[in-house]
Amino acid sequence: MVARPEPEVEAMDAELAVPPPGCSHLGSFKVDNWKQNLRAIYQCFVWSGTAEARKRKAKSCVCHVCGIHLNRLHSCLYCVFFGCFTKKHIHDHAKSKRHNLAIDLMYGGIYCFLCQDYIYDKDIEIIAKEEQRKAWKMQGVGEKFSTWEPTKRELELLKHNPKRRKITSNCTIGLRGLINLGNTCFMNCIVQALTHTPLLRDFFLSDRHRCEMQSPSSCLVCEMSSLFQEFYSGHRSPHIPYKLLHLVWTHARHLAGYEQQDAHEFLIAALDVLHRHCKGDDNGKKANNPNHCNCIIDQIFTGGLQSDVTCQVCHGVSTTIDPFWDISLDLPGSSTPFWPLSPGSEGSVVNGESHASGTTTLTDCLRRFTRPEHLGSSAKIKCSGCHSYQESTKQLTMKKLPIVACFHLKRFEHSAKLRRKITTYVSFPLELDMTPFMASSKESRMNGQYQQPLDSLNNDNKYSLFAVVNHQGTLESGHYTSFIRQHKDQWFKCDDAIITKASIKDVLDSEGYLLFYHKQFLEYE
């Protein structure tokens, strides 16, 4: 279980604001009138604000090798050459002419062939943003998320073209692959889970974020807002999340670099940064409670974990409640002692999970997580009732459930003597009832004996699975993929840029590393 970190002080924000070193190969481009030349490229071939510019772009922006305008067309920054990125025509040009920089004509990103990656440069970013805003203004858009008000001509066109695009059960809008930027599968799978979180999607697509940062370009929430726009724009080509990666590196330095990272660690770091950057969206001050945060991250992901420590002499109970963003669960096969399955589990179905003999279930892991634990003589606490140090028991229960419950199955074991991955299969259900693990249900559980809730009509604590993150491989070398639910019974596998349809069986048979559940019914506060 990872508790939600407290907000960082401004001094740390200032420290993290220093970006990592950029591309060292930009020097050959930044000579003479490079800014003027770059602005001309953005105006004519990328943003194209006027109708004439868009026509010119459509006619002239074709690959100089195959004559096609698709396949992620890029333009050389040193000479007049357009080439396909997908078919490597721009790569061949870069190699033969030693022109190592090119610009993506769809999104405006700069690619370095020596770094073999999209790069970030503050000066170029400023020019790109300025030219983009100019193009929006020419088109009458103003701001990217401003309300659309149709002109008289557009109203006439709407009358003569009444057909609307309907979102059906077979619609694939929202499905989009992500380019792997070099061992970034850990990030891609979490992005897929977040972009398919229903309430988070609704928040960003309704333009609810109001940035109060001095530099919006360094705001991760602004970038997530743009990311949601990209995912639900209807485009099917893989998205390149280079800006997101740069911001994560900037604000979570321990994740910087192209080494393999942990998806769970990235999730917690991303939620932490999003939480800190959501200050402008937080109306918690209205509650006259300076410690209360009501940002979208806390509304969706934050739960309350109750810890009851009971003195074994006077049976006095000390209770604390801590916020959490996820629940980390031990697995059989780890160095942490596990308990055998209950005798009645064989051949039974509990919480929608099939309990075969020897099979560990998510419910089993939650039972272990919430069972009383004897702290032992080496961990005595000072009892306020006895006024002396006594042995005690500790029990964790759920005081408040989050809207989205994320369960982290602890498959990676790190210790002084051991580093390994635990591959124990854990059965998890499509629907999960958390009632047995609530603090309010504690009285009904005696000596570790758990029963299904008698009131089957209580839906407040019921969840539905909507995303699963998996890890294939070993601790030293592996790959992350994810399953996401597009509609109620439609599942897709996301493997970086590749999206394929999956069956429910594929999902439930997978190993499971991070399990994302969404509340079935939401209560108003």
Swiss-Prot record:
- Specify one Pfam family: zf-UBP
Q: Which coarse location class describes where this protein primarily resides?
A: nucleus
Describe the processing and modification events after translation.
Phosphorylated in G2/M phase, but not in G1 phase by CDK1. Ubiquitinated and subsequently degraded in a CDC20-dependent manner.
Note the coiled coil stretches, chain numbering.
none
Q: Which GO terms describe its biological process?
A: G2/M transition of mitotic cell cycle; positive regulation of DNA-templated transcription; positive regulation of mitotic cell cycle; positive regulation of type I interferon production; protein deubiquitination; regulation of DNA repair; regulation of RNA splicing; regulation of transcription by RNA polymerase II
Q: Where Phosphoserine occurs along the chain?
A: 237
**What is this protein's name?**
Ubiquitin carboxyl-terminal hydrolase 22
Q: What organism is this sequence from? A: Mus musculus
Quick one: which gene encodes this? Usp22
